[in-house]
């Protein structure tokens, strides 16, 4: 019989908030008796934007901005019902996007 896995993918702009949320999920899963694989750091997505500084002329004067999206992957192997309940009740930081696949 095939074991059931829960794959959790986290995304955030701030890596410190992301790492804290990841550690909170790992601690919750281990406390309820599940085995955790990860966190696996995935490649960062870097979006760069170049805008003109002035509203009129002077094309040589520009600002460059970038947004870095940090990602982590967690696998929870053979989760118990207590693990699923604890993860559903878990309250994470506001800046973290969570995707869950069963």
Curated annotation (Swiss-Prot):
GO CC annotation, single: ribonucleoprotein complex
Gene3D superfamilies (UniProt xref): Ribosomal protein S10 domain
One BP term from GO: translation
GO molecular function: structural constituent of ribosome; tRNA binding
Keyword Ribonucleoprotein attributed: yes
Annotated InterPro entries: Ribosomal_uS10, Ribosomal_uS10_dom, Ribosomal_uS10_dom_sf
Coiled coil, from the record: none
Alphabetically ordered keywords of this record: Ribonucleoprotein, Ribosomal protein
One Pfam family it belongs to: Ribosomal_S10
Function description: Involved in the binding of tRNA to the ribosomes.
Stated family: Belongs to the universal ribosomal protein uS10 family.
NCBIfam families: PRK00596.1, rpsJ_bact
Subunit annotation: Part of the 30S ribosomal subunit.
Name the record gives this protein: Small ribosomal subunit protein uS10
UniProt source species: Paracoccus denitrificans (strain Pd 1222)
Taxonomic lineage of the native organism: Bacteria, Pseudomonadati, Pseudomonadota, Alphaproteobacteria, Rhodobacterales
Gene: rpsJ
């Amino acid at each position: 019989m095939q074991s059931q896995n829960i794959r959790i993918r986290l995304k955030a702009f701030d890596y410190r908030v992301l790492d804290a949320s990841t550690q909170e999920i790992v601690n919750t899963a281990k406390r309820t008796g599940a085995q955790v694989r990860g966190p696996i750091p995935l490649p960062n997505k870097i979006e760069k934007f170049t805008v003109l500084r002035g509203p009129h002329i002077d094309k040589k004067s520009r600002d460059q901005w970038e947004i870095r999206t940090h990602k982590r992957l967690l696998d929870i192997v053979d989760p118990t019902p207590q693990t699923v309940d604890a993860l559903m009740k878990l309250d994470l930081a506001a800046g973290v996007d969570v995707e869950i696949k069963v």
